Amino acid sequence: MLKFLITLYLAFFSLSATAADLAREKRLADEIVDMIVEGEPVWLKADNHYFLSIYTPTPQHHPRGAVIILHGRGMHPDWADVAAPLRTALPASGWHTLSIQLPVLEKEAKYNDYVPLFAEAGPRISAAIAYLRDTGVRHIVLVAHSCGAHMAMHWVARHGDRDISAYVGIGMGATDYKQPMKEAFPLAKMHVPVLDIYGSAEYPQVLNMAPERLAAMRKASNPQSRQIVVPGADHYFHEHNGELVKAVAEWLDQLKL
């Protein structure tokens, strides 16, 4: 009996230790929701939890589709680097954007701490897709940065890429010191076009994995897939967000969907 109780306690402790920090997520939402200038807040539901998303429509009369943006580790859908520049700029190229809040942990959490949360992101991605489908969007592109890319790849590995028209991975493969990736990216099995984009001043793990990612994309054999390096950019594209937006927009513009 004692052994059973100890096992039950450890299981509960493990579950609670890896559950998303909903209180911190709420604080992030409270901080930004009234500060949104471009776009509008949309509350989507997944796993009986409402999470913040920011929808920014294109002004063009004939939209090309919509882009779902997944931010990096511990951030929010209007983060100053990567997320906000993409969500506010891509509408000018004919794309609606929907930047969603991903599960977060405390600020000090590392890659290994976030691995159990990858599965929690899946229902949010699916909810975002369902929302866009309900508005009549046909082509949906998933754009994911850093930890968001890990979460996106976890979802693709289990769900497939049938519900998206293309995928953009930004700074893919980032982890922490002596914390190797727990899950391989399913790039070789993807059917949709893939853009792998990263900066030349990236984290070592992202740079070291670049040839492996390119080989996997070539194995998938989609002629529209590309790997692009932004000179001088670090993992967060600080002071290089303009180049990031330009590269992503140009790649999206040439897609034959």
List PLM regions with ranges.
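Sec-dependent N-terminal signal peptides
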Residues: 4-13
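N-terminal signal peptide c-region/cleavage motif recognized by signal peptidases
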Residues: 14-18
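N-terminal cap/lid segment of alpha/beta-hydrolase-fold proteins
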Residues: 20-60
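Serine-hydrolase catalytic machinery in alpha/beta-hydrolase-like enzymes
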Residues: 42, 48-52, 57-133
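Extracytoplasmic/secreted cell-surface and envelope-processing proteins
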Residues: 77-79, 107-110, 151-153, 176-180, ...
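Primarily recognizes the serine-hydrolase "nucleophile elbow" in alpha/beta-hydrolase
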Residues: 131-190
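The feature captures the conserved acid-bearing segment of alpha/beta-hydrolase catalytic domains
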Residues: 166, 171-229, 234
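C-terminal catalytic histidine-bearing segment of alpha/beta-hydrolase fold enzymes
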Residues: 222-257
